[in-house]
Amino acid sequence: MEDIIFGKRSNVFDVNPENTVFVLIAGTSEVSTVPGITSAGATPELTRLTPAIDSEIIGEGKCLSSKDPPMTPEGIPTPAIVTKAILSLTNIRYIIVNGGFYAKPKTPFIETGLKPSNNPAVKTAIEDLDAAIHAGEHIGRLLDGVFENIILAESVPGGTTTAYAVLKAIGINAKTSSSMKEDPFSIKEKIAEMSFRRKLEKSPLGAVKEYGDNMMAVSLGISSSVKRSKIIFGGGTQMATVMYLDRLINGMRDRYISTTGWVYYHRTELFSDLGLSDYLAVSAMDFSGMKHPGLRYYQYGHVREGTGMGAAFLLARLMNFEAEAIYKSVDDFYEQFI
């Protein structure tokens, strides 16, 4: 499989619809409303709704809380469309978890009672860290040993900014990726600096509470309870940050990460800096031949990753679906949104 690049220790998966579950942890961070910080919505205000609508696309195959799917300001569609098409193609089961919804999706989800994460430049990001971790622990116990492979994915607009702030707080000065073609690094840096002036916290869990988001905390809780199954963190530099934190806090084994080539080649150094390269599987997707222009834009540095898109592609390829069949399923599914 030339379109899957495995690290030295990441080619270890046996995948089928019975032994694998896809868990989407979706939630809002008020960071996403800062102008220029993310393209995960047509306007900063609409980014608050993206996690709920992404969840509806994954759960129902359509938008119920909005006429249209989440789009970038340029009109490029949410990666949830890609992920849902692949999950439908492979028949892999999914679970949606409330990681701090601003608006509740109109599809079944695991209710954690979590509220949106705050902008850390203004106040503590996670109001009840223990509750978020505890919710994750319960979910982890439910899944552990039932499935051989547990994919943890996210829909958190602004999450590369919270990831950057958390890493910087614990002494890792590395750039995260972005859903935008041009990374708004100066804005991320300003938010981190304002957050540190408000309160400086250098411990891993303390940094998650002060500068992170609920998705991070729920993921850490899930991992702490999973002893028998493999976990694949499905995502880009957000989930790389979670995996690194998981090592520091939980010290778990059988943990891997899968992302798209668009993220990996944008921020290759982050994965090596965090010591994750050996446990990484890169989905080197090629959208240049997609039927619809909105999808072709992915090939040129827009969006890059989200809702576990890279991990979903990995699962399909491991199940011996040809790349062209995967691309066709995405094109066909996107038709209904046009």
Curated annotation (Swiss-Prot):
GO terms for molecular function: nicotinate-nucleotide-dimethylbenzimidazole phosphoribosyltransferase activity. PANTHER family: PTHR38811, UPF0284 PROTEIN SLL1500 (PTHR38811:SF1). Belongs to the UPF0284 family. This is UPF0284 protein TV0153.
